[in-house]
Amino acid sequence: MELNNVILEKEGKVAVVTINRPKALNALNSDTLKEMDYVIGEIENDSEVLAVILTGAGEKSFVAGADISEMKEMNTIEGRKFGILGNKVFRRLELLEKPVIAAVNGFALGGGCEIAMSCDIRIASSNARFGQPEVGLGITPGFGGTQRLSRLVGMGMAKQLIFTAQNIKADEALRIGLVNKVVEPSELMNTAKEIANKIVSNAPVAVKLSKQAINRGMQCDIDTALAFESEAFGECFSTEDQKDAMTAFIEKRKIEGFKNR
């Protein structure tokens, strides 16, 4: 697939995905969503990639939202299809077995906030702005905002942000738990890469199963979640990485890399 709006790069075991529509503040149109879907598939099938960083081109905007110029003439059926496409792509990103870090530079509004929330970890530049302003445009959040925001910041705060169409600064996003860390713009990508490299230095199977267990637990009762955790925990003992790491620990030496098996 020819990529016009998304850039995929690899730096060792880390994939860097850049949404590249700076003239449109990296707004998400249908073509960009389809390219994102393709890129996620490429990452899924690349065994060398163990972590992902998602960012936006330029310093002004991570993703300013869904593309209003495309949406304004949509009818009910077209709007529903657009929402289904966005939700499909964001859910696929969320379920990717490899941890995904959002490096949020500038505006993360509407679909931009929603795609950031689909990532596992969110690092924001100090000039970042977050919000779900859709009701001010006569629509609801359509790419998961009504569901993921409340899971991250609580129902009351999610309702306040969505009902008021209020945008918040990075430090407020940190305070309410929407982002993990705020750094200066010049340090954003370095910080994201530092975290990604810490992740890929650990046992990949254990990281993958930990992500699955956390995600599963958010969608079911505690007993079902704990049963899944026990299965994941047990599965780790079938891996070479577990044997090698525990042997190295007992022998008081550092393990010389994991094999991802």
From Swiss-Prot:
One of its GO terms (molecular function) is lyase activity. The active site is at E114, E134. GO terms for biological process: butyrate metabolic process; fatty acid beta-oxidation. Keywords: Fatty acid metabolism, Lipid metabolism, Lyase. It comes from the Bacteria. Homotetramer. This is Short-chain-enoyl-CoA hydratase. It comes from Clostridium acetobutylicum (strain ATCC 824 / DSM 792 / JCM 1419 / IAM 19013 / LMG 5710 / NBRC 13948 / NRRL B-527 / VKM B-1787 / 2291 / W).
